[in-house]
Amino acid sequence: MLNRYPLWKYVMLIVVIVIGLLYALPNLFGEDPAVQITGARGVAASEQTLIQVQKTLQEEKITAKSVALEEGAILARFDSTDTQLRAREALMGVMGDKYVVALNLAPATPRWLAAIHAEPMKLGLDLRGGVHFLMEVDMDTALGKLQEQNIDSLRSDLREKGIPYTTVRKENNYGLSITFRDAKARDEAIAYLSKRHPDLVISSQGSNQLRAVMSDARLSEAREYAVQQNINILRNRVNQLGVAEPVVQRQGADRIVVELPGIQDTARAKEILGATATLEFRLVNTNVDQAAAASGRVPGDSEVKQTREGQPVVLYKRVILTGDHITDSTSSQDEYNQPQVNISLDSAGGNIMSNFTKDNIGKPMATLFVEYKDSGKKDANGRAVLVKQEEVINIANIQSRLGNSFRITGINNPNEARQLSLLLRAGALIAPIQIVEERTIGPTLGMQNIEQGLEACLAGLLVSILFMIIFYKKFGLIATSALIANLILIVGIMSLLPGATLSMPGIAGIVLTLAVAVDANVLINERIKEELSNGRTVQQAIDEGYRGAFSSIFDANITTLIKVIILYAVGTGAIKGFAITTGIGVATSMFTAIVGTRAIVNLLYGGKRVKKLSI
């Protein structure tokens, strides 16, 4: 019989729409200002931590909507941002640096919806507000560090082999030259070092010199490593900030994009992400007196560094260990109530420190704090010129063989200790980064974008509904129900997809798909009217109308989907957001126009003697 659906099709349609509605509902409940407490590396939030948080809030007379332990983190919700800020200040003072206390916006989804993992759509920066950074890796510094490592490595190899040399100098293009006493020593060094360092191109220069430069493959590998490692370290630092759904991705050869939606403390984010602090551990050269140190007359294997008070200290150039080997660090107070940072090393770092200290017991070792800061000047390309700042923060005699754990003192105050421990815990950047573009979108502007987007969607929907009802009467009402179902399904699917983020271009995609859905219904209705004018019966006209329109609707939507797939494959950011919502909308509009409206029409007219259609 014409225009009849089996029961399973009606059940399927109802189930799909109900599921879409359930997963779209969380978007109606908004968000609560919240404070999120997560454990730092190696520490997890527990029931005991939850009790401590509740007690602190009670003592400070701060009222929370709820405080709960969820998936290893504590989430405290508040009625206003003022209360949220007060709570964060109170909790930061109590929790210490074993926990990350971060401002956040938590979905106010009811528990019964959360139980089925129904969550609101993830909103992009333009809708939720937040901060966007475009960072550039300082490749010159990265390759300069590698040049220093090559110098140290070649010196060590020549000493080990017993080949005498007089001087080692830096050359252009991150190369180096070594001067020997005679050509014989130089030739012996070239033969030995070429085997030991296949990534260096070593050649003779002059009568008694060799020149070593990094191969193109090694330079390319070093650049790639610098960017990739900085991305990993920035991700660790973002985790320390406790930001939900951050974006950290590469852009071009030496740039990194960081997007932090919903973040409220942008100054703190900039400080943590852009910080370049690390530590170097070096032996103090006690053979040079203070007068020589003050005048800078020191041996070639040493250099003068300053303490915070401006006192000169002569350190050997050889670096025993850098912050790259630090796996964990926490701040605390020593027996004299002075701030200190407790350091834990990886196995390789522990072995280096152990082997070095066992042979140097009784000698002073210095902790050198190294940081790159903006000089306020610009280079020829308009980029900020970074200045390397070094400061001896601690000198201590090696009293025993050190292993994987030790502590450093000489830090000014607890805040500085906490900041240093956080940076060391997240990892030292392989090369300094410069923030070349910063864009902050406030929550007010984000809310304005949401309101404008909703207005655009509703306006498009209302105009479409009016058009359909005026032109197609009862069939226009049926098409209207399909449009509403289409919008519900788009929002529900967007909320379900873990990687989908809604942005302003995404809203444009939704508005576009509403137009596509109207187009499909217009095709169907016009085809039915055409069949009726050709003398078909009502039942035949409905059946032929849907059959005849199907191929046109299918072809048009498939070509649109192909374009959407191409946009998603080659596009970035906003283009991908537009492609996702458009693709989802095209699929749901086909479903609601072909299956949804047909189901309603079949219920109303299927198997009945109808002489005239309201179309």
From Swiss-Prot:
Subcellular localization, as worded in the UniProt entry: Cell inner membrane
Pfam families listed in its UniProt record: Sec_GG, SecD-TM1, SecD_1st, SecD_SecF_C, SecDF_P1_head
Residue spans, topological domain Periplasmic: 30-455, 498-501, 581-585
Residue ranges annotated as Cytoplasmic topological domain: 1-9, 473-476, 519-563, 606-615
Alphabetically ordered keywords of this record: Cell inner membrane, Cell membrane, Membrane, Protein transport, Translocation, Transmembrane, Transmembrane helix, Transport
Entry-linked InterPro entries: SecD, SecD-TM, SecD/SecF_arch_bac, SecD/SecF_CS, SecD_1st, SecD_SecF_C, SecD_SecF_C_bact, SecDF_P1_head
Tree of life domain: Bacteria
Gene Ontology biological-process annotations: intracellular protein transmembrane transport; protein insertion into membrane from inner side; protein targeting; protein transport; protein transport by the Sec complex
Region (Required for protein export): 279-426
One MF term in the entry's GO annotations: protein-transporting ATPase activity
A GO-annotated cellular component: membrane
Principal subcellular localization: membrane
Membrane spanning residue stretches: 10-29, 456-472, 502-518, 564-580, 586-605
Membrane topology: Multi-pass membrane protein
Assembly behavior: Forms a complex with SecF. Part of the essential Sec protein translocation apparatus which comprises SecA, SecYEG and auxiliary proteins SecDF-YajC and YidC. The SecDF-YidC-YajC translocase forms a supercomplex with SecYEG, called the holo-translocon (HTL). The stoichiometry of the super complex may be SecYEG:YidC:SecDF 4:3:1, YajC is in the reconstituted complex (with SecDF) but as no antibody is available it could not be quantified.
Family: Belongs to the SecD/SecF family. SecD subfamily.
Descriptive protein name: Protein translocase subunit SecD
Organism: Escherichia coli (strain K12)
